[in-house]
Regions:
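Glycine-centered secondary-structure boundary/capping sites
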Residues: 44-45, 162, 199
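Short interaction-prone segments
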Residues: 155-194
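A structural signal for alpha-helix termini and helix-coil/disorder junctions
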Residues: 18, 119-123, 174-175, 193, ...
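Generic detector of ordered secondary-structure context
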Residues: 7, 24, 64, 105, ...
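Domain-edge interaction signal
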Residues: 1-156
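Short alpha-helix boundary/capping elements
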Residues: 36-43, 177, 192-196
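Short, charged, intrinsically disordered terminal tails
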Residues: 197-204
Length: 205
């Protein structure tokens, strides 16, 4: 399926404009795009944007994603800026400068988009990265992720423990200076036990 750049770009503007997904960084955006295409594929039989996804350590990345972001910024539809979240941590934040054109999407596509926002919109980038790692398309892919593998999900008994560790990590990022002695060391031990790997959102792709 050929990528529909117009839909891809307007979907990016839509996510950047929607209050339910703010703040929006590049890692979170790329995972929302992936889950939108995968959800529509499972429901209807084909993705919305037709984008090809590459397998990166922190989840799927649309091959045309960076190009779309550059074009949107060039035409002043979005703004990308480096935002300081703590004394030492920064995040690349994406903000919409104009309203998206949603008339190009079908009613079924809009239902899919809103369902993705409802299900994933409040998740952080690290949580979405972990969730994308449970997808068969990510587990069995080498360099690029064929969405044909997407209808199946992979889950293990470790999933709940992983989710708890991610939630704790997100709590620490939210209030890094207000933790009791030993909290961070204990959290790192738990993450290591669960064999998870994280990265600061300030070092996004």
């Amino acid at each position: 399926m050929k990528v529909n750049l117009r839909k891809l770009m307007q979907l990016i503007v839509f996510f950047a404009h929607h209050e339910a997904v703010k703040p929006l960084g590049k890692t979170k955006l790329f995972k929302l795009l992936y889950f939108t295409d995968v959800t529509h594929l499972r429901t209807v039989g084909h993705p919305i944007t037709g984008a090809e996804y590459l397998k990166y350590p922190y989840g799927p990345v649309p091959m045309q994603g960076n190009f779309a972001l550059k074009e949107l910024q060039k035409h002043r539809l979005i703004r990308q800026e480096r935002v300081q979240i703590t004394k030492t941590r920064f995040r690349r934040q994406i903000t919409a400068l104009q309203m998206p054109d949603m008339t190009i999407f079908t009613a079924q596509e809009m239902r899919t988009i809103h369902s993705v926002i409802q299900q994933y919109g409040e998740d952080t980038a690290s949580v979405l990265s972990w969730k994308s790692h449970q997808e068969s398309a990510w587990l069995f892919a080498e360099d690029w992720m064929p969405l044909q593998l997407a209808p199946e999900k992979h889950s293990t008994e470790q999933d709940e423990k992983n989710a708890e560790a991610i939630a704790l990590l997100d709590q620490w990022y939210a209030t890094p200076d207000d933790k009791p002695p030993g909290y961070w060391d204990d959290l790192l031990k738990e993450i290591e036990t669960n064999r998870l790997q994280f990265r600061d959102e300030g070092l996004e792709l």
